[in-house]
Amino acid sequence: MEVIDFSATKKREPMKHHAALPNSVRAIIIGPSGSGKTQLLLNLIMRFMKWDKLYLVAPSVDDQRCYKVLKDYNENASEIKGESVIDFITDIDDAPSVDDLDGDINNLVVYDDVMLDNQKNPARIFSRGRHKNTDVIYVAQRYTQIPQVIRDNCNVLVVFNGINIHTLRNVWNTWCSDMDFNRFKNYFSHAQSVPHGFITINLHDPRSRYRIGLDQIYG
């Protein structure tokens, strides 16, 4: 009796975001101050991800000039749609819970520099947000200080130039079981060769799992 491989006949879902990203994004972006994290984040929000409602949770959102582009965009979009498309949230206790999210639209929740705050909210969004059609991005300087539940539920990791060898080895040990450490260091050296360079690891796409930046496939 022939056994049919139904996985081979399953239709591929239409691409929702940039090719480097899965359709359901649970991403961590790490790198030291000034490495380029915020500029990449703005590009993801404004160019590379599809969303209808954005929740930006950042204690210093009112002090960062780089977020002015989002405030201007929100002002213009609000005039057209009659409602705000971006919520700027400075207190993590005011961030939406999973139950608050509208699963009928594309939600994006971003946590930027919230390491010193209560981590229950981002942990729950990383764990359950996909059931409410919600993508999530967590931006931080130190990978090992991010709560384990967030790291365990992450499916995209972006690592910027400037991290220390301890963090690099921790990333390799967790994410890159299919290559030895020397090869991983060679892979990361591409990020070190250019200003604001970074690597992207996507667990959901084995054919292009490792990228230099967003576009160049490694390996």
Question: Language-model segments: which ranges?
Answer:
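Pre-Walker A adenine-sensing motif
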Residues: 3-21, 42
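Short linear motifs in intrinsically disordered/low-complexity regions
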Residues: 6, 64, 94, 103, ...
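A general structural signal for short secondary-structure junctions and capping/turn motifs
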Residues: 19-20, 45-48, 149-150, 188-193
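Conserved P-loop NTPase motor cores
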Residues: 25-49, 59-67, 73-182
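An amphipathic, basic-hydrophobic helix/alpha-beta surface used to engage anionic
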Residues: 54
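Conserved AAA+ ATPase small/helical "lid" subdomain
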Residues: 179-218
